[in-house]
């Protein structure tokens, strides 16, 4: 039992990841929407999260190079985790000194730095989960704990943010986020470094640019050799996430347009919705462990299509609490369910030599889908009615199905009929 306590640490670090993620994709966009900024501006602010899909550029350092002193004192993974946490806390302190609505350019820069620090932490956490687990089943459990923590972080950063903004103002919201983030270094110091069967080949010396690109090259070549249809995997992941990314990005502008109140959004969409998302994420992890990756990914992708369909129905009906609750239930369950499953799929694509880099490549595809589609969604929503917008979203998202069936073996679903 004691050996499994690291899962609590994974859950807490996932919570911090969810909190900082929510800052970019919900808290600041909500504040901008409340200040009557248009959907294209609200959608464009998500571009500040671009580091989430560029993690592969610096993940080789995290795989192969150890932080001086910290790497020796606390271990390779924990040393990197401490550095990312410290810089994340410092950037959050900077963010506290400014109002996001006053200068969008400065806001975007600060959010970009926060995204960089948070994505670096995610690289370390992803690698830690993979290296710390000893079986495929335990890997599924670890990803489930991380997913639950991530959703709890989103819950704190949404419901807590909305109610704090009403009672105390937005500055208190960001103080709350900073306080939660400060727990990160304590958690890192409490968990143990993964014990590897083979000695990790790392160094704490600075490397020149040629060596740096050589590490990236080896990582990508290694990944490419194992995944000969890498571009196909990229396309598949891009389409797979479309049914979740676009409704999530445009949800707040839609709800405010339909005259839902801050209280209704906080209680139904964020509090109730994120609890449903946790349930979905938990069931997704259990399903992947029971029936295997192939069938789990298919089921997750199909039920995920219900999200834009329900948003289209809600937009057509207008303000209606019952329809709103049904929409939130379906959207959040599907998001949690499919999100956990696709994370396990990413982990199955990695080998042991370049775990952090290869997982970063995989997860970057998902982040790229979310960020680009959120930005383009904001532009399209400005020129289309909400029902037409979500109808187009549904049709576009369905394209993953023929790719899945036609190229299922090339998408690394080898022995896909077997359990993981």
UniProtKB/Swiss-Prot annotation:
Presence of keyword Cell membrane: yes
Keyword tRNA processing: no
Main location: membrane
Pfam families membership: MFS_1
Matches recorded under InterPro entries: AmpG_permease/AT-1, MFS, MFS_dom, MFS_trans_sf
Protein's cellular compartments: Cell inner membrane
Family annotation (PANTHER family): MAJOR FACILITATOR SUPERFAMILY DOMAIN-CONTAINING PROTEIN 3 (PTHR12778:SF10), SOLUTE CARRIER FAMILY 33 ACETYL-COA TRANSPORTER -RELATED (PTHR12778)
Official protein name in the record: Putative transporter AmpG 3
Species of the source: Rickettsia typhi (strain ATCC VR-144 / Wilmington)
Lineage of the organism: Bacteria, Pseudomonadati, Pseudomonadota, Alphaproteobacteria, Rickettsiales
Originating gene: ampG3
